[in-house]
A protein has these predicted regions:
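Histidine/acidic residue-rich metal-binding segments in metalloenzymes
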Residues: 1, 84-100, 106-169
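Metal-dependent catalytic neighborhoods of phosphoester/phosphodiester hydrolases
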Residues: 47-55, 83-86
Length: 170
């Protein structure tokens, strides 16, 4: 074999937004991609299985006729995410992962995690469910240079999560 052709690749980080904004872009993504990881940082964020399922229905309704596009839904982790919600997500085939947004680091992250230990019960459930953890890896410490925020996140937060949850898919 000398050549590989990807006819319908996957998009592993897609912001579709919602409403009219989503309707204006989802068709283009669906024509180019077979599947996509749908980012949950809407306003309000997609924090529950029922919200993810409703958002997926909105996406599917906006797709062009006969589209085979498969949106893979993601839950937005908060300090209040409970293991039962993760277990329910693990049982829902349309939900692929959950995402950690540190509070205040990016668009619509105000509801994000204030301290990673607050989501340890949810991470334990994710490890049991074999659900991937997606990460917006950045700290908000004003003492940390903007160009160092990702590396500091890895050193101070992610390394600890990897150590504490060795079976978690990150």
């Amino acid at each position: 074999m000398t050549r590989i052709s990807l006819i319908k690749p996957d998009d592993w980080h897609l912001h579709l937004r919602s409403g009219e904004a989503m309707k204006s872009v989802v068709g283009m993504s669906a024509r180019q991609m077979g599947r996509a990881i749908i980012m949950p940082n809407l306003s309000p964020p997609v924090k529950s299985v029922s919200q993810a399922q409703a958002y997926r229905k909105e996406i599917m309704k906006a797709l062009p006729t006969n589209s085979s596009f498969n949106p893979l839904m993601v839950l937005y982790l908060t300090d209040g995410t409970v293991p039962k919600e993760i277990e329910a997500a693990g049982a829902a085939p349309e939900i692929y992962a959950a995402k950690l947004y540190p509070a205040g680091v990016t668009t619509n992250s105000d509801n994000g995690v204030t301290n990673v230990t607050n989501i340890y019960p949810a991470l334990e459930a994710m490890q049991k469910e074999e659900m991937p953890l997606l990460v917006h890896g950045e700290v908000t410490d004003p003492e940390v240079d903007v160009f160092d925020r990702e590396s500091v996140f890895i050193e101070k937060i992610l390394d600890r999560v990897v150590k504490d949850f060795p079976g978690l898919k990150i």
